[in-house]
Amino acid sequence: MLYVLVNITMNPTISKSQYVRGLQCEKALWLFRNRKDLLLEPSSATKNILEIGNLIGKLAMDNYPTGIEVTTEYWDINGAIKATKKYIDDGNDIIFEATALHPITGAYSKIDILKRVDNTDLWDLIEVKSSTKVKEYHKDDLAFQYYVFSNSGYKIRNSYMMLIDNSYERIGDIDPTKILRLIDISEQVKNKQNEVNRITLELCNSLTETGEPKEKIGEKCFKPFECDFKSYCWKHVPDYSIY
């Protein structure tokens, strides 16, 4: 039997996307939580990337026709956790957007695909990305998800990235079973757990501050993504700057 923590008294504190944002810059995370009025409108290129991501996500789900999706409102974390547990209790072995919350730090996560290992109480985590190779921030992303799920009662066997297979040749309709491939990054994910715990605590602590953190601008404003608070932080930088 799976003993998943459902009746959580800890309030949700930080999500996976917020964790990844905080890794890039603590100030960006603080602004995201406290000054969303400063966010840049997403560019057409960003919107296109999101659309492609949604398409790849749908293809990934098509690989698992018996899967069931958690469809609670995005802000209803406790509702999503309870729905996930109900689907498991009902005997579902594949759950899309399965949700868990760390009982101590309040970190929470929605995994793209939670898949039971056949005839066991073990589970695999599968994170889907519209990329052809594993990037460092993908490892951080999945390491955070492992951190949340493994500490909330799930026995995790393996952690996978599901990526685009660039050797796939399309003939007719896209075959979802061939255009995507699984890459096992379980060891890298496990090796990051102490780091994830430390950084999560640091980020949660920084979010309690009343003023924005002091951060220097520079290369990190562009890697792994161009920050959507760049116009705010760079407002005093002249056009001829080396940046």
Residue ranges and their predicted role:
Residues 93, 112, 122-124, 157-160:
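Beta-sheet entry/capping signal
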Residues 1-119, 239-243:
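Metal-dependent nuclease catalytic cores that hydrolyze phosphodiester bonds in DNA/RNA
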Residues 133-136, 148-230, 236:
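Metal-dependent nuclease catalytic regions and adjoining charged, substrate-binding loops involved
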Residues 107-140:
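Non-catalytic protein-protein interaction segments used by genome-maintenance enzymes to assemble
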Residues 140-148:
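Short amphipathic alpha-helical face segments that pack within enzyme cores
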Residues 48, 52, 101, 105, ...:
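Conserved aromatic-histidine-acidic binding/catalytic patches
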Residues 98-102, 115-117, 129-132, 163, ...:
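Short, flexible loop/turn elements at secondary-structure junctions
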